């Protein structure tokens, strides 16, 4: 692990920055990308100008408007964001084949060996940030270290347009100054549990015996937190081909008009899809239900989230919502559900049903 050179690159307020780039009059203005406040929408992301007001992703748009009435709300243009993301990923692959995208706007790169024939990961990161700016007009931040865990934490340390480099001997001192909640994957419940027992910083964890953490959090979670606090992360950068969709469908033995039978079949197929989605460690952004009529005509309905999710309750409730909107005009011979726009999950919060009440 010591000899590895890992870079984590994270675009700065990606969606909002694209909108400010394409609409110069929005530069310097609080920009919120997401649903409008009057329609019970949700904030997908926002510019740094808006973040100064306490606005953040997954916040109800109505609340964001209350915090900053002069903010400009912009509908997401995912086709544009995907095109810009493709430019950025192309750059990464010019540097190294070992690229692991986490979402449209961030990725890990293993540059231990690289196409630039450069030995300094710092210089490679500087090159990448400069090229992103030149090719897209956008800024990004990067973290450089010997593990994915530390590189990702480092990339957020000096945002926006920042670069933080943590060689092996700097990892423990850097981590020791962080709050426990700064460790990725540590939620409020875990943080509060530890705080009740006198753990407030990563340094507190570093100085405690692993047995104490296991006693508080359980063997697996306690061990995980202990290793994270010491910057230990053996995970490899895993390039993957994007799978376009995951689906499951069922053909009835006889065409049916029984709504309960059709729905229970759809629910079973949906559960199968969600199980596969989680087994593959992916998140999705679009849910589609498909049905086929007795005359073999295919029909479909779909819903696209503002952000990716793999939350079972969210996906099942959207599937149910779509099903309830269908007006069947005759017997059905096939029903199925699929998810698409698949990506590796970001470590940030996934949307849940409460976040997408704009669809109710």
Swiss-Prot record:
Question: Catalyzes what?
Answer: DNA(n) + a 2'-deoxyribonucleoside 5'-triphosphate = DNA(n+1) + diphosphate
Extract the GO molecular function terms from the UniProt entry. damaged DNA binding; DNA-directed DNA polymerase activity; magnesium ion binding
The protein's location, in the record's own words, is:
Cytoplasm
Q: Which InterPro entries match?
A: DNA/RNA_pol_sf, DNA_pol_Y-fam_lit_finger_sf, DNA_pol_Y-fam_little_finger, DNA_polymerase-Y, DNApol_IV, IMS_HHH_1, Rev_trsase/Diguanyl_cyclase, UmuC
Q: Where is this site: Substrate discrimination?
A: 15
Q: Which cofactor does it need?
A: Mg(2+)
Q: What residues form the catalytic site here?
A: 106
Q: Mainly localized where?
A: cytoplasm
Amino acids binding Mg(2+): 10, 105
- Pfam families xref list: IMS (PF00817), IMS_C (PF11799), IMS_HHH_1 (PF21999)
Its Enzyme Commission number(s) read 2.7.7.7
| UmuC domain segment(s) | 6-187
Listed GO cellular component terms? cytosol
Instruction: Report the cofactor remark.
Output: Binds 2 magnesium ions per subunit.
List, in alphabetical order, the GO biological process terms annotated in this UniProt record. DNA-templated DNA replication; error-prone translesion synthesis; SOS response
The record's CDD domains line, in alphabetical order, gives:
PolY_Pol_IV_kappa
- Report keywords, A-Z: Cytoplasm, DNA damage, DNA repair, DNA replication, DNA-binding, DNA-directed DNA polymerase, Magnesium, Metal-binding, Mutator protein, Nucleotidyltransferase, Transferase
Enzyme class, UniProt record, top EC level: transferase
What biological function has been recorded for the protein in this entry?
Answer: Poorly processive, error-prone DNA polymerase involved in untargeted mutagenesis. Copies undamaged DNA at stalled replication forks, which arise in vivo from mismatched or misaligned primer ends. These misaligned primers can be extended by PolIV. Exhibits no 3'-5' exonuclease (proofreading) activity. May be involved in translesional synthesis, in conjunction with the beta clamp from PolIII.
Q: Which family does it belong to?
A: Belongs to the DNA polymerase type-Y family.
Quaternary arrangement and interactors, per the entry? Monomer.
Q: What is this protein called?
A: DNA polymerase IV
**Gene that this polypeptide is encoded by:** dinB
